[in-house]
Amino acid sequence: MHFIDEVKIYIKGGNGGNGCVSFHREKFIDRGGPDGGDGGRGGSVIFRSNHHLNTLVNYRYKQHFTAENGENGKDSNRSGKSGKSLVLDVPIGTQIFSEDGNILFYDFTVDDQSFEIIKGGSGGLGNSHFKSSVNQAPRKRTEGEIAEEMWIHLSLKLLSDVGLVGLPNAGKSTFLSVVTAAKPKIADYPFTTLVPNLGVVYVDDEEFVIADIPGLIEGAHQGHGLGDKFLKHIERCNVLIHLIDGSSNDVVADYNTVRLELESYSDYLKNKIETICLNKCDVLTDEEIQEKINKLQKVTNKEVFPISTCTNAGVNKIVKLALETIKNQE
């Protein structure tokens, strides 16, 4: 399954049906009055959030969507049938923007939300509406309303409580696999994670959602590497878990690289609560661990937690701390 989180599509409401020109015809009634019915209303275009979806791949290849037109009016004052509305399902976390991205029309944050973005066109009036004392046999009717059409931009931001950040190969995917049932691709080389991965963490009969975002590199906010494409997915989370590769020769530089990218991308990310973890401590001596923690704490003025996703050392503490932070923000 391809992970698609940005698409542009064309949508159009259904046109209203035309009104009918008709006159009553019945045996022994030579000149019946007007009995043209109204046209049916066109179908609307409606978006609906669906928790079964997690990508916009359904809109990658088909990009034009039109609701059904209303039927024309009929004789005997029969109205045309209304057109069926077009319901388009999207994942929770989808945002609907104008084509240029400057106007946010709607933001889906829970399951089964609906948003009518285009109303169907009104049906035209049949000639029976235009009968008057001076015109007993009107041939006037109105045409159905032409429905609105537009190009829109759909953008998916994954909904998670916790976002995992760090340089490539910091151990984020391993962390996710240890604390959840998610099975991300894991290998000992950069950019193993090519798409965001989500997992559910269960702690003491409670749960939260955690997202593993592809590794950041210097210049990610400018489009370098993979990070720029996926940074938006952690804008909604409550807390960031920042993993640093303890085997790195310069853990402070690694930390600063990621922080710069977060701060350059948006104020939302800049101000997120951050839990800093020194990972891969299983390959370090106690003295090396303490030395690197001291360096990080001097720069960050925050507590730094030593962990190992290989031995699970310290991981459970981080998970419980994340849950506590989430609950304190609710």
UniProtKB/Swiss-Prot annotation:
Instruction: Name a single GO cellular component.
Output: cytoplasm
Ranges where the Obg domain occurs: 1-159
Q: Which GO terms describe its biological process?
A: ribosome biogenesis
**Compartments (UniProt record):** Cytoplasm
Q: Which UniProt keywords apply?
A: Cytoplasm, GTP-binding, Hydrolase, Magnesium, Metal-binding, Nucleotide-binding
Positions binding GTP in this chain are: 166-173, 191-195, 212-215, 279-282, 308-310
**What's the cofactor?**
Mg(2+)
- As recorded in UniProt, its EC number(s) are 3.6.5.-
Q: Which GO terms label this protein's molecular function in UniProt?
A: GTP binding; GTPase activity; magnesium ion binding
Where primarily located? cytoplasm
What Gene3D superfamilies would the database entry show?
A: GTP1/OBG domain, P-loop containing nucleotide triphosphate hydrolases
For the ligand (Mg(2+)), the binding residues are: S173, T193
Q: What class of enzyme is it?
A: hydrolase
Describe the location of the OBG-type G domain by residue ranges: 160-327
What family, per the record? Belongs to the TRAFAC class OBG-HflX-like GTPase superfamily. OBG GTPase family.
Q: Note the subunit structure.
A: Monomer.
**Role of this protein:** An essential GTPase which binds GTP, GDP and possibly (p)ppGpp with moderate affinity, with high nucleotide exchange rates and a fairly low GTP hydrolysis rate. Plays a role in control of the cell cycle, stress response, ribosome biogenesis and in those bacteria that undergo differentiation, in morphogenesis control.
Recorded hits in HAMAP family, A to Z, give: GTPase_Obg (MF_01454)
Name of the protein in its database record: GTPase Obg
